[in-house]
């Protein structure tokens, strides 16, 4: 990447082959596939289109300028498709569409013709049109020429003409074209830096560069030339349908005066100014954009039931992270203690598999709207390697999931009344509440067992830069809007927090956490005293008294499948040394038991409900490096070895520090570990004495008391 700008090294990272989409990108969105898609062909050029959603009025996005493609709409289309039928297409020159060579293939009339042909092919009879930037001209032209097929027009960052009669504009256009063709990477840096002036925009900037990289400077120059000299000013005056103009007053690409000009041209048009906003609201301010589009196109108040205030039951919504099983088990323990303090409080749950499955088995109520949630565990499994999960980049690339799930949460808050929202590592709700604090309607309690993203690779300057940027964003959010979190709970003790800095020029994590969180102590989902009679527990669970029980488990995702395979390879040697050994491999809720090795004497089980009971009476546990399982083993004083996922900052830094505080860091690196070495270490561990520090047992009760105080809201009253 030596020819690339420095910001590519710091923010964008390694790029795929230029001029085409990455080979693994079959469709634009990771959380939603089109209900149908295809191509239209005009003059030998094929253009791709997709349709999302199966009910409701039509929304059609006019195809985006060739420097991007449909994936730019990943924060908006998956949500809008819950309420509308949504049409998108890739403009010739990028995405899944053809990339013809030669200026003759690139003209506004060609773009407009492709759009009409694709709308006809999909049977879109009447639609709300959305035109972003240059494609505002497409939307305005269509609305003027086909009023019978247009219900609404929304333009974002748009303009009504691209005339170049001013010599200064002509020279700027010429210089831009030369830069596109001679130094495409540098042009992409300049262009997307201008589009996203908002602080902490590293992810949309990176995405923009990648979208542009799927085309080329030459193609985009031809494509841009096709827009030049276009003018729909007179056509805009003929638009009769409701029109909304959205424009940022800090837009450096298309000054807000261009948006105001559209408002003045279209009779009755409304203007939504985004204070401090740049050029691309669908990418940078998707919550605002999605809600504005939904409300404008719907036109009427949403249905549902409004309950008079004093007729409402007291209700809490508990958002539980579905990554692994530890969150939901501790959350259920907290909920149980909260019910003791607030017996009239109804609790609904907001999560997905595998946490949702656990709650259903426990008889809890999942809100029906959770069927709309995108699955975070599936994303983590998709980006993981062999016992390797770059946790920070897994979080960073989860942006489509986060905004979609927040929008589902936002819909629920619009439709129903809750007295309290509790979010256990609900990063989506926490982030978008801070970005849109006006949406918060009730007290919000935030829980986490770690604070701060930390780089794992010493020589990776990009990871360090982006971790610090994310941390700074969080710090600034909390400082500016302290009222978003009515209570922030750290599941643990002060000494469990690392003293490392958040990044260059940022505070130390421990000092900041002390000022911004209350500590609950560790929160167990059970009382270890209930499992003190291990012989009785073994008998109840079907284990024989003279057996040596080894249990291998990898938590609530499928990421640890390779670890279970390696443990299975070590089993024969262990069995030879300890003939009475009985080993159980637990596949977990998202890993098929059929995928695990089969051999004599090795027991393979699918998901085991409340696995902590089995772990509490085992002679050895071999587990992944997650916090919950390892701390449960510490609490029940069981020998164990843990194998943290490579490059997983939480498991390798935060969890290991906490385990060390309890005298229980039993971590081994998976990489390079042979079955023989694993067997040897396991045999040593099974005979080693356990000297752990006792784990506190009142964490759930302490958390519940704090939460109840938020519900009571009398902390400020004088006694």
Question: What is each PLM-predicted segment?
Answer:
Residues 45-99:
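Conserved HGGG/HGGXW glycine-rich cap/lid loop of the alpha/beta-hydrolase fold
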Residues 88-130, 134, 291:
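Active-site loop/oxyanion-hole signature of alpha/beta-hydrolase fold enzymes
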Residues 140, 144-145, 150-179, 642:
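Flexible "cap/lid" loop of the alpha/beta hydrolase fold
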Residues 164-170, 179-235:
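Conserved alpha/beta-hydrolase catalytic His-Asp/Glu region
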Residues 239, 245-247, 251:
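Short beta-strand/loop motif that positions the catalytic acidic residue
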Residues 345-396:
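Conserved nucleotide-sugar phosphate-binding/catalytic loop shared by glycosyltransferases and other
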Residues 448, 454-558, 588-589:
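A nucleotide-sugar donor-handling region in carbohydrate enzymes
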Residues 503, 521-620, 671:
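Donor-nucleotide binding loops and adjacent catalytic segments primarily
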């Amino acid at each position: 990447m030596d020819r690339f700008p420095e910001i590519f090294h710091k923010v964008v990272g390694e790029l795929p082959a230029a001029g085409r989409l990455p080979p693994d990108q079959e469709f634009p969105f990771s959380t939603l596939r089109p209900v149908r898609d295809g191509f239209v062909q005009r003059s030998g050029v094929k253009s791709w289109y997709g349709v999302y959603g199966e009910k409701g009025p039509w929304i059609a996005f006019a195809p985006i300028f060739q420097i991007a493609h449909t994936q730019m709409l990943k924060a908006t289309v998956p949500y809008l498709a819950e309420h509308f039928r949504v049409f998108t297409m890739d403009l010739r020159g990028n995405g899944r569409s053809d990339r013809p060579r030669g200026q003759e293939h690139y003209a506004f009339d060609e773009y407009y013709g492709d759009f009409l042909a694709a709308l006809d092919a999909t049977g879109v009879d009447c639609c709300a049109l959305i035109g972003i930037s240059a494609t505002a001209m497409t939307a305005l032209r269509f609305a003027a020429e086909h009023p019978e097929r247009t219900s609404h027009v929304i333009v974002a960052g748009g303009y009504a003409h691209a005339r170049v009669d001013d010599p200064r504009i002509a020279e700027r256009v010429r210089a831009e074209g030369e830069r596109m063709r001679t130094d495409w990477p540098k042009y992409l840096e300049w262009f997307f830096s201008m589009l996203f002036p908002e602080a902490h925009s590293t992810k949309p900037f990176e995405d923009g560069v990648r979208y542009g990289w799927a085309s080329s400077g030459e193609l985009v120059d031809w494509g841009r030339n096709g827009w030049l000299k276009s003018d729909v000013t007179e056509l805009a005056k003929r638009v009769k349908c409701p029109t909304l103009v959205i424009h940022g007053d800090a837009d450096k690409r298309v000054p807000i005066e261009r948006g105001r000009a559209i408002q003045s041209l279209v009779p009755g048009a409304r203007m939504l100014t985004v204070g401090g906003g740049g050029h691309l609201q669908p990418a940078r301010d998707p919550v605002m954009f999605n809600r504005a589009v939904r409300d404008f196109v719907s036109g009427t108040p949403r249905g549902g039931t409004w309950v008079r205030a004093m007729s409402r039951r007291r209700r809490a919504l508990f958002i539980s992270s579905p990554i692994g099983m530890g969150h939901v088990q501790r959350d259920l323990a907290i909920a149980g203690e909260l019910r003791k303090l607030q017996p009239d409080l109804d609790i609904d749950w907001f999560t997905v598999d595998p946490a949702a499955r656990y709650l259903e088995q426990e008889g809890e109520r999942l809100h029906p709207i959770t069927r709309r949630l995108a699955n975070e565990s599936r994303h983590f499994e998709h980006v993981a390697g062999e016992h390797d999960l770059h946790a920070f980049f897994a979080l960073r690339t989860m942006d489509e999931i986060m905004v979609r799930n927040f929008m589902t949460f936002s819909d629920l808050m619009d439709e129903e009344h809750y007295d309290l929202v509790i979010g256990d590592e609900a990063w989506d709700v926490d982030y978008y509440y801070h970005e849109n604090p006006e949406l918060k309607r009730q007290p919000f309690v935030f829980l986490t067992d770690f604070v701060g993203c930390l780089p794992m690779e010493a020589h990776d300057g990009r990871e360090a830069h982006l971790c610090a940027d994310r941390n700074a964003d969080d710090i600034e959010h909390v400082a500016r809007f302290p009222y978003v979190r009515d209570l922030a709970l750290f599941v643990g003790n002060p000494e469990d927090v690392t003293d490392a800095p958040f990044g260059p020029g940022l505070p130390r994590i421990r000092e900041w956490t002390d000022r911004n969180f209350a500590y609950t102590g560790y929160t167990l989902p059970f009382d270890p005293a209930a499992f003190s009679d291990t012989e009785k527990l073994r008998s109840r669970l079907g284990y024989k008294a003279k057996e040596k029980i080894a249990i291998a488990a990898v938590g609530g995702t499928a990421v640890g499948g390779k670890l279970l395979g390696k443990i299975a390879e070590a089993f024969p040697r262990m069995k030879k040394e300890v003939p009475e050994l009985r080993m159980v491999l637990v596949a977990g809720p998202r890993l098929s038991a059929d995928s695990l090795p089969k051999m004599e004497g090795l027991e393979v089980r699918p998901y085991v409900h409340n696995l902590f009971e089995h772990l509490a009476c085992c002679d050895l546990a071999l587990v992944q490096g997650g916090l919950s399982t390892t701390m449960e083993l510490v609490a029940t004083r069981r020998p164990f070895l843990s194998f943290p996922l490579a490059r997983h900052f939480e498991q390798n830094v935060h969890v290991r520090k906490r385990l060390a505080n309890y005298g229980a860091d039993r971590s081994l690196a998976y990489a390079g570990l042979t079955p023989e070495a694993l067997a040897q270490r396991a045999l040593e561990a099974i005979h080693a004495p356990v000297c752990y520090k006792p784990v506190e047992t009142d964490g759930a009760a302490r958390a519940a008391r704090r939460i109840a105080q938020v519900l009571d809201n009398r902390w400020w009253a004088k006694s």
